[in-house]
Amino acid sequence: MEFLEYLTPITSHQWGIGSVFLLISIPLIVTRLLTTFWSWRELSAANQKAPGQKRGPTRPTTIPLIGHIVSFLLDGPGFLYNTARYYGRGIPVRVHLATFPSYVISGPELVSAFLKDSTRSLTPMKRSLNYMEHAFGCPHDLVKSFATSDDKDMEQQIHSALQNMLSGPRLGILSERYQQSVKSQVLSVDAGIGDEWVELPDLCTFVETHVFQAATRTIFGPSIVDLNPTLAKDFWNFNKRVKTMFLGIPAWANRTAIRARDDMTEDIKRWQRHAEKNCNIDEIPEDVEWEEYYGSKSTRIRQQLLTKRGITNESARAAENLSMMWATNANSIPAACWFLLQTLHDPLLQARVRKELDAVRIHDTEETNKAAAFKFDITGLTESPLCQSVYAEVLRLGVAAMIVREPTHDNLALGDWKFKKDEFISVPTNNELMDPDFWNSGTPKDPHPLDKFWADRFLVHPDDPQSGPRKDAKKQKAKSDGKPYFSMDGCTWNWIPYGGGAHLCPGRNFAKREIMLTSAIMLTAFDIELLTDTLPKHDKSLFGFGTLPPIGKAPCRIRRRQL
């Protein structure tokens, strides 16, 4: 009797746990079964429709009400990679990411049609306005000021200001100033690197801090940096938390991120007030390409166009300036860090890269500081085969953005598929950048998996028909000198770190120069030895918004290099 009494509480306790388990698991199982049935029903219905009339199925889910957001937050790249293959590439699959339902599309036919947007029927406007408000801090009642207006000429002028800054002669002027600014910053007394070895706890923190300041001085002028001693720290703190604001997490549940954004907008407002007080922007001569209050001519023009558009509220202007600052730093600087880390990690690659850099390095006769008496032929640098291949591979491996558009009219056809007005359509760039059916992954004797860095992936060796970026590489005409050369032939709709087609990033040419010049200057100005055999991983927590920065530290020792 006593034995049975002893067992009773245990049995009751076990049944209690079992009941809780059943209460939790039954809704999950039922949800999975129902959504799987419905998904297959949608796919079956699509297969019976004519081309141009098919509707994509919804991916099954397990958790009721909240959709796929948990899977996305746990492993965004893996979730979207598997989504694209759930029914096979080329079939759009609908997912629900909290307040953001979207069709995920993949495959060359759909992706090229989406990016080309030949009928100009896709727009990023709604998401852009969402980002302007929630991520960059534009007041809610003013955010529509940034929407397309009836003043088409004004829209064209704003777009033209960006295009002119980042292409043609102005690109060359801006790139030369950037080169000088980075050199001055990293070789300054404040940087703390001399002729003797010093140890840094993290190479990337050094690069992020000093290159951000150099880039910001180039684009916005020196005042914004001088007025805000913590600007670099504030920016990277904001960048670390920006994803939660992009996703629209309510402010009451996201106070740390909101504080980080507010720190940045206050820094920018301080600069705006200083510039307005000390400089009459309308009196600056048209031919002045750069001055100390507003920096580049493009920044100055953008401020004038905002005024003409009626956007005079300082918070709204600070939001626009923060969006520009984020766009010009948050992707290119982490990419430069990866260029450096991958090069320094491989002594043979480092020697090959430095050989190319030496070939395009010239003596800077105007520089009085002997350690900085060098500069690069920027055209020669950006055409260097190996350096270009390293650059392209860094972006292929590290960029994980979501290109999001929505149809401007009902029944938009992309390939065989139909989309309704205002439905979000997304291309996760890493799905195409990591496509095993497209990219060259080496040979059985010399494999180079797509999730591993391969410096030569974009080089064509004339004597090796299996070289080059594509798995199905066609025989390419060899150059007369017989040397390896950089190639992107046939990669237009797979190598898409900058998007493509109608909405190709206008800053891509300057970003390439930022990444390559930063890396070239660091490798030329300094001897750098990594103090770890293992490189950091990509920070997948920032998936969806551009270049994934390193997570963890890369300790090193560094000294000025004797040229």
Swiss-Prot record:
Its EC number is 1.-.-.-. GO terms for biological process: terpenoid biosynthetic process. It is an enzyme of class 1 (oxidoreductase). It is a single-pass membrane protein. Keywords: Heme, Iron, Membrane, Metal-binding, Monooxygenase, Oxidoreductase, Transmembrane, Transmembrane helix. GO terms for cellular component: membrane. It holds the Pfam family p450. Heme binds at residue 505. Its cofactor is heme. Its main location: membrane. Pathway: Secondary metabolite biosynthesis; terpenoid biosynthesis. This is Cytochrome P450 monooxygenase efuG. It comes from Hormonema carpetanum. The gene is efuG.
